[in-house]
Amino acid sequence: MKNRFCRMGKTLLGAACLLSTFGVTYSCSDDYDLPDTKPSFLGQSIYDELNKAGNFKTVIRLIDDLGQTSVLSKTGSKTLFVAPDSAYTEYFRKTDPNFTSLDESYAKLSINQKRMLLNGSMINNAYVLEKLTTIEGPVKNLCLRQTSASSATDSIPYWNWQDLPDNQNKGQKDENGKTVNADMRFWDKLRNEAHGGIYMALDGTNPLLTHFLEAQMNEKKIKNSDISFILNLDGTPEAWDDSETAGTRSYFYDARVVKGKQDVTCLNGYYNVLDKVLVTPSNMAEVIRTNGDTKYFSAMLDRFSAPFFDRSLTDAYKLLNDIAADSVYKKIYIAERSSMTSLTQGPNKESLNDFPFLPFDPGWNQYTVNQSTKEQDMAAMFVPCDEAMANYFVHGGGKVMIERYGDMENNEANLLHNLYQIPLNVIQPLIKNLMKESFNESVPSKYLTIMNDAQDPMFAARQYPSVDAYKANFKKVLLANNGVVYVMKSVISPATYASVMAPVLYDKSTQVVNTVLHADDAYTTDKYTQAPLRKFYSTYLLAMQSSFSFFVPTDEGLKNFGYIDPVAMANTGVKAKHAYWTFEPASVTAKDGKYLAIKAQGYPYDPTKDLDPANTRAKSGYQSLANEDLGNNWAQSKKFMLCEMIDHHILVHDNDDQLGVRGERQYFLSRNGAPVHVKSKGNSAGVGMEVEGGLQIDLKNDDQPANDQNITVSKVYDMTRQTNEYGNGTTYYINRPMQASQNTVYGAMQKQEQFSSFFKLCNDLSSNIGSSMLETLFRTADMKTNADWRKERNKYYIFADNAASSSDNPGARITATQMKLVRFFNAYRYSVYVPNNEAIDKAVHEMHLPTVQSIQAYIDAHTDENKKLDSVAKIKAQAMVVTLVNFLKYHFADQSLFVDQCTATTECQSACSDEETGGFIRLTAEQTPGKLNIVDVTGNTVPVSSSLNNICTREFELNSVATSARYITNSSYVTLHSLGDKFLLFSSKVKGDFAKAWETVGEAKAFAKKYRIKN
């Protein structure tokens, strides 16, 4: 084959060279005399060879009628796939209901039908079959589809108005009688009798020619039996198995190349004889619409479609055809990937910001897989037949949706109407789950690796133990020009319907949370940076191997109570700025931006009262409508608060923790690390459970009982795998949102009298005295600028400066006014174990723990009249500072731990390090029911106070100074515990007496080196 291909190339080259000499075309060969002979393998032109054969008269007629005679009878470069007249006779028997003869049926063909038959079976290049799997590069064995001579203008039908999609969706009525969740009715403008009809292409791109050839099949590990099943050959004499004797075959769509009739060499290319007429099928959406057994699914799919006017298509089609219409439309499915890239508006300029996109356009002829070319792959869809849809929605798992949204009795007679009433965002996960981007990876032999929307096996081995068992689930297979449609006998629910998101998706009382969960759905395959929230919550909550407790504030709670703005509260000195916000579902009509279909309204916050927007005048100017871009003004605050709220209401449990929040434990950490306290458990299902965040705990512990917030679970949905076989947790509806504490570690220590001595030690390091002392001891000659010195100085600080970080003040962090942040905490969860005043007094006066004041006094005592510090004293003073800083930092550790009803041992890292080991110095936390003990590195066990523990705080950094900030850039959630009159030791060296660290200059040097302050 390879030699013959090369031989023809040389022949045509020789012919071209001789043309100018002899005026005719010749080819090179060793066994002929010019100009009377040519190579025996080289025939006449394609046209002449077909004409001479005598049994391709229909093909010849097509060529003649379409004006291609001269093209195919002269030197050129074409490949044709032709069927004999007998095949055309069979073709017309099946397609012409009034068939009498081949000639009569042919005479009925329109010019467009003729174009489709000829152009779809012709490639505008000369290829032998074995080269058709090579793509540009060249890259061998990857090509599945070829660009043929077909064009989108070959057939653009005229559609009567009543044949256009008829969207029967009515939407739902909210409590005020307003229509909500209604479809965008893209077709209504054209679907009216007065308009008459339209010319509309099923897609604006040219269809390709799909082939199943050995080299590509081998490369992609596609079996003969896969193609046999796809072409519906199983059970027929043409069935193709995987045995060694099965032989090789070549198919173009479902037409097979006749053995011995391939690569017939002609002067201007090749032709291949097929066993049937090659007809380019329509796209997947259209074969689903027209096959007669998937009308319910097709109706739902068409709700995502819209007619778009196409000027270039209009002009091109009018050049070929005499039509009176001024406009030609193309049918486009609104999807993340389609021929219309970056689709943000509907055909009438409607905003698509909150439209639930499909993953790809099933009508896209030139469908392209991500990271691939259109020639290498196509799509696959798993579509339930009508009987399966009826069983699912009338009697099965989809019944709940019809009962929730349908407005007629749930029976098969009313099914189509009721299906239309299911909102698009609810039906979209079902459709999306059944759309697979790769044909190559979705063939039957690979069924165990086909994944659902949660990336779990869609066809589990326990249900489908063999390929044959898998195939038995299908009624038939439909081949389209851009993919394969597997028609199923059952409906496969998406993981979305089994996850903790499902109740929220279905429920009209949780639309605010649902909007946030799905805000980024249209950006999951690409364009990640353009997602409005960039949180991708629906993807996160589809982790079906996880176990979630998902707390959902209802729309009523978000409207009637609201959410305190932690950023506004950070401006502690200006009470007039303090605010809380309510959130309500809304519609987006704006275009070309990042929007969220939620209205936010601000109200003044009175810390002595509970939130009561119904009886409070809204703050003037404190509003963000759905049409406000999320990068602007209060929309930034809206985005931040809603994302923070969702993060705080998602809890992830260990997979072996089947009880979750209904178990013995009372304290849990949310997705973002914020604590959730289960105050009471409610009934056996969890209804009546009381929960609270750090803010609610703080409010109940203040002296204002009127401001208390009581949060109660009203509904519980068991979505666990233990109950449902497939699931990932439990969904709890609550009457209002939880919130994290607005206290910082600095503020919490400041408020607790028992912590005042420890707090003073921490704070003194960054005082004027402490800063001056540090400069005396640690500033070196190479620290020429203040920025150089401050970078070094900050290592010894516990609290960072409350200012914007800059080159002149690196390490500074903006937070609430009059507050400071723990310098070395950064977007994680931590605990601080605080010795009380008695413990610090013991450490200082009995064990000689240095303080800033005592170190400064030591420095002063060893500084001469020329203000020169004695070198030995300096080394010892440095060791004193290292001792003090490490003593303090050792009480700051990672992991938020609680005095709780649990038993666990946790290895924690403190904030101080050991230069010799190269790691952070550890401590061990031992939890038993109602107790928490800390074991320090010396082996000393210190119990956490039973009366002062579990103080929830939050370290938060603002995007700007508190007076103008809009959101928090990062947070750490920190739990404070009192150690009573005990403290922790970071080194055995200082056990009994801290002064051991600097008894001699050598010991001071070694100690300062081993425990040097690095960060």
Show which residues each predicted segment covers.
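Mature, structured domains of secreted/extracytosolic soluble proteins
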Residues: 5-6, 11-13, 26-1015
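Hydrophobic alpha-helical membrane-embedded or membrane-associated segments
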Residues: 15-18
